[in-house]
Amino acid sequence: MAPNIRKSHPLMKMINNSLIDLPTPPNISTWWNFGSLLGICLATQILTGLLLAMHYTADTTLAFSSVAHTCRNVQYGWLIRNLHANGASLFFICIYMHIGRGIYYGSYLYKETWNTGIILLLTLMATAFVGYVLPWGQMSFWGATVITNLFSAIPYIGQTLVEWAWGGFSVDNPTLTRFFALHFLLPFLIAGLTLIHLTFLHESGSNNPLGITSNCDKIPFHPYYSLKDLLGFMLMYLPLMTLALFTPNLLGDPENFTPANPLVTPPHIKPEWYFLFAYAILRSIPNKLGGVLALAASVLILFLSPLLHKSKQRTMTFRPLSQLLFWLLVTNLLILTWVGSQPVEHPFIIIGQLASLSYFTILLILLPLTGALENKILNY
């Protein structure tokens, strides 16, 4: 019998073990679709980004007009740009849902997979931030100024660090050129980290909604989940195309249609919607260093999830009290996102402070306590 190339060829064997014959739990729900959706998002972003980079000029005098030129004169340039800009929003929707799934179903107990995932999130945030600066509109310029300036809160080396990052004494041409270089480089770093993330995942196999081992009744990934993922792709591309074709500027800031002007500060400087929750936490502390630390903690707190798991059950499927807290946390993040988009005035200041406090309280105190309480109730 002729050897099966899919199982004998070194490269094909690797692909086969990752995407075709991969043993998968039979009961994973649609919440497990987001990993593959993130992969498709990354591929879409790299492709559209590459096409945009061919027409972009990383120079303060030309950046804004080169983007306008892409939209006006390049064949389907407007579509490529709209897909790239809105694709970033979809990327973040998928990654936040992916993380939410991880918290709900206790996937963070696969520590290596979880930690590489958080590093992926941080890299994605950095990529999105430097990318937002490239069109060189008002919000691009001032967003870059405000966010990079936060590093000056670091004692002793802060100011030097910021000037080193800027390549001068303010955000200017050197800043734009290096941000373009970084924005081109980081997605490939994300792709590399994704492979590491998957390697760790395939060491242990996927978790499932029951949080119990499913080794005895696993099914092959293809055709079952390859088909299920295909449905996910279609359901994701539908809102992306709708956004890009009907309301491409819905999630953008009107301020960015004005070319960058260092002499005019926009009335409300705010980042893209996917950073607003962290921005609200940053603003809710009336001290620069304190705010920066809270901002960092808002994402880095995820590293503590495996250590704060006190329940004897892995998932929240059969833990109604923890479920209540989880959905409170989700609502809390939505409130923070809304507050981050509002001006710094009453009542938004106090709402933001309370929401920030409850965000950390739920994650650090209430969830572990509830896990322990549920153990007690169930006589574990």
UniProtKB/Swiss-Prot annotation:
Its cofactor is heme b. SUPFAM superfamilies: a domain/subunit of cytochrome bc1 complex (Ubiquinol-cytochrome c reductase), Transmembrane di-heme cytochromes. Its main location: mitochondrion. It comes from the Eukaryota. Binds 2 heme b groups non-covalently. CDD domains: cytochrome_b_C, Cytochrome_b_N. Keywords: Electron transport, Heme, Iron, Membrane, Metal-binding, Mitochondrion, Mitochondrion inner membrane, Respiratory chain, Transmembrane, Transmembrane helix, Transport, Ubiquinone. The keyword rRNA-binding does not apply. It is found in: Mitochondrion inner membrane. Heme b b566 binds at H98, H197. The chain crosses the membrane at residues 34-54, 78-99, 114-134, 179-199, 227-247, 289-309, 321-341, 348-368. It is a multi-pass membrane protein. One of its GO terms (biological process) is mitochondrial electron transport, ubiquinol to cytochrome c. One of its GO terms (molecular function) is ubiquinol-cytochrome-c reductase activity. Heme b b562 binds at H84, H183. A ubiquinone binds at H202. InterPro entries: Cyt_b/b6_C, Cyt_b/b6_C_sf, Cyt_b/b6_N, Cytb/b6-like_sf, Cytochrome_b, Cytochrome_b_C_euk/bac, Cytochrome_b_N_euk/bac, Di-haem_cyt_TM. GO terms for cellular component: mitochondrial inner membrane; respiratory chain complex III. Heme 1 (or BL or b562) is low-potential and absorbs at about 562 nm, and heme 2 (or BH or b566) is high-potential and absorbs at about 566 nm. The cytochrome bc1 complex contains 11 subunits: 3 respiratory subunits (MT-CYB, CYC1 and UQCRFS1), 2 core proteins (UQCRC1 and UQCRC2) and 6 low-molecular weight proteins (UQCRH/QCR6, UQCRB/QCR7, UQCRQ/QCR8, UQCR10/QCR9, UQCR11/QCR10 and a cleavage product of UQCRFS1). This cytochrome bc1 complex then forms a dimer. Component of the ubiquinol-cytochrome c reductase complex (complex III or cytochrome b-c1 complex) that is part of the mitochondrial respiratory chain. The b-c1 complex mediates electron transfer from ubiquinol to cytochrome c. Contributes to the generation of a proton gradient across the mitochondrial membrane that is then used for ATP synthesis. Belongs to the cytochrome b family. PANTHER family: CYTOCHROME B. This is Cytochrome b. The lineage of its organism: Eukaryota, Metazoa, Chordata, Craniata, Vertebrata. The gene is MT-CYB.
